[in-house]
């Protein structure tokens, strides 16, 4: 019996080893090396590295450029998280009922999510630039009333955020629709028999039942926004005057334009810690939803 168990365990280990080796080679080893680099003064391809302790972390947390990128990322995250959640929830509520061609509408709203973020960014740069300028010229709008969507410090970040909302709202719409379909029909039927209208059903039944889904989507959006790189890089390259430079873009500039590999890695570790906290919160909310 014990010999059979040993053989069975050997088979299990044989199946696990390839995945474990892959995980160690492509995740654990690079992370350990990155963690070590964050404590050194590594510069570009220079093989010489010296241990500097927490100097890179202190510099990052006191550097105005990094703190500015962090604040830009927080504003971008708040805008996109709120906008995408509201848009996705509104679309889900509209397309969950008896709507003609609702499957077609769901596919249409989900389609932008299948497109590359770089392509989406270039399309919206063209809309903000060429199409908008052509429309302004056609309508003879005074220059004082014209909007510089990506050239104004106050508007560039939110123009970029609107692009992100347009691209991702369809994905979160499907998650909300799945949550709405899990709500028992008996609850809505009982509310209808009691005379509850559509708004009362949404406010008192659907939204409370969707609270775990809303929380999960919020955290997923926050994680995605903190990692955003493609949209600011493709649309504005961080401009104007750093108004759209996110943490990920700041790390890229530090590593590949300034060649300060150790310092950039320390910034990456800080970003990793922020995302890890948000990921832990996601798992906690998922477990809470399953328990309920």
Where are these regions (language model features)?
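A structural signal for multi-pass alpha-helical bundles of membrane permease subunits
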Residues: 4-292
């Amino acid at each position: 019996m014990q010999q059979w168990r040993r053989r069975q365990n050997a088979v299990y280990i044989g199946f696990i080893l390839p995945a474990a080796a892959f995980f160690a080679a492509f995740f654990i080893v690079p992370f350990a090396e990155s963690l070590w680099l964050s404590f050194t003064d590594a510069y570009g391809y220079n093989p010489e590295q010296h241990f500097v302790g927490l100097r890179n972390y202190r510099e990052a947390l006191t550097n105005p450029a990094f703190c500015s990128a962090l604040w830009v990322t927080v504003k971008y995250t708040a805008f996109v998280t709120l906008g995408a959640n509201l848009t996705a929830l509104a679309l889900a509520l509209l397309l969950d009922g008896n709507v003609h061609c609702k499957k077609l509408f769901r596919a249409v709203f989900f389609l932008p999510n299948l497109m590359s973020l770089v392509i989406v960014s270039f399309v919206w740069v063209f809309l903000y630039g060429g199409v908008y300028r052509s429309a302004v010229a056609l309508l003879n709008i005074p220059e004082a009333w014209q909007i510089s969507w990506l050239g104004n410090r106050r508007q560039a970040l939110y123009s970029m955020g609107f692009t992100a909302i347009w691209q991702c709202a369809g994905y979160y719409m499907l998650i909300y629709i799945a949550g709405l379909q899990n709500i028992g029909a008996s609850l809505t039927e009982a509310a209808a028999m009691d005379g509850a209208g559509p708004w009362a059903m949404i406010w008192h039944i659907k939204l409370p039942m969707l609270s775990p889904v809303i929380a999960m989507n919020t955290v997923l959006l926050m994680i995605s926004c903190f990692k955003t790189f493609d949209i600011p890089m493709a649309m504005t390259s961080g401009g104007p005057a750093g108004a759209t430079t996110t943490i990920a873009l700041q790390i890229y500039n530090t590593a590949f334009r300034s060649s300060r590999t150790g310092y950039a890695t320390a910034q990456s570790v800080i970003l990793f810690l922020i995302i890890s906290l948000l990921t832990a919160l996601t798992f906690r909310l998922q477990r809470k939803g399953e328990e309920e």
